[in-house]
Amino acid sequence: MFAVIIGLSIGIGLPMQTAINSRLRNAFSSPLLSSMTSFTIGTIFLALVALLITHSLEIGVDLIKNQPWWIWVGGLLGVIYLTGNILLFPHLGGVQTVIMPIVGQIIMSMLIDNFGWFYSPTHALNIIRILGALLVLLGVFLAISAQKLFSARKEIISDNSLLQNSNRNSQWFWRIGGIVTGMFSASQTAINGHLGTVLNSAVKAAFVSFLIGSIALWIIVAVVEHGYHFSPAFNRKFPWWIWIGGLIGALFVLGNAYLVPLIGTGFTVVIVLLGQITGSMLVDQFGWFAAKRNPIVPLQVLGIILMVIGIVLIKLF
C-alpha cells in the first residue's frame, strides 16, 4: 500500500510540474531552455539529497566497467521523451500527443515485465493483464478527451484542422514516433530502477539520471539556441514557484527508481499513470499554477474508474 501511495503521489505531481514548466517556458520563451533549467535545478536538488543520505556522490570505476552500458542511458531516454513531446504536438494535436506515448509506455512496461528486461522483476503476460492494460488505455482516453467531447468538439475541431494540413502518412510517422518515445519512457523507469539496485541508492540513481539528462540538454541548447539566454526570465516579475518544476521532476524520477525493484515496471507505470491523470484533472478543475480552468465532467470520472479496474487486473494477475 505504501508503494501505491508513493506511485500515486509522484504521478499527481507530474501535471503540476507541467503547469509550472509552462510558465517557466513563457519566462524563457524557449521550451528547450526551460527544460534545461528545470533539469539542472532537479540535478542540484538530488545531489544535495544524495550527499545528505549517502554522504557521497562517488561511483566506483570498477562498477562502471562491470555494468552494462545501458544502465547509464536513463537520463538520455528522459530527454528524448521530453523533446519528443515538444516535437509531436504541432503534428498530432493535444489529444494524440498525450495518448500515443501512453500507449508506448503501457506496451513496453508489459514487455519488460514479461521478459524481465533491464533485470526487472518478471511478471508473465496473460490475457487478464492484457485486458487490464486495455482498460487502462480506455480510461486514459476518456479522462483526457472527455472535456473535448463535452464542449461541442471545439478543441477536437481545432486539433483536426491542424492535422488536415499534414500528410496522412506523416501523421502515422509521428504517431509511431509518439509510441516509441513512450516506450523509451517506460525503459527509463526500468533502467533507473536497476541502477538504484546496483548503486544501493534510489537517490543516487535519480541523481545520475538527472545529471546525464542535464548535460545532454546543455549541449542541445548550445547547438539549437546558439547560446544560453537567461535574462528574459529575470527581466520580468514571475511567481517564485516557476523554479520548482525541477524539484517535482526529481521526486518523480526518484520515486520510480525506488518503486521498480519493489513492484515491477508494469505496475509502477500504470499506478503512476493513474496519479498523473488524476493530477491533470485536479489542475484543470482548480486552475492550479495559473493553468486554464476546465471543470471535470462525469465521463472523466468513468475513465478513472476504468483505470482503477484495469490496474487491479494487472496487479492481481
Task: Give the role of each language-model region.
Residues 101, 107-127, 278-298:
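C-terminal transmembrane-helix exit sites in multi-pass transporters
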Residues 1-9, 23-26, 32-36, 40-70, ...:
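Membrane-interface interhelical linkers
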Residues 26, 30, 84-100, 197-201, ...:
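Structural motif at transmembrane-helix junctions in multi-pass transporters
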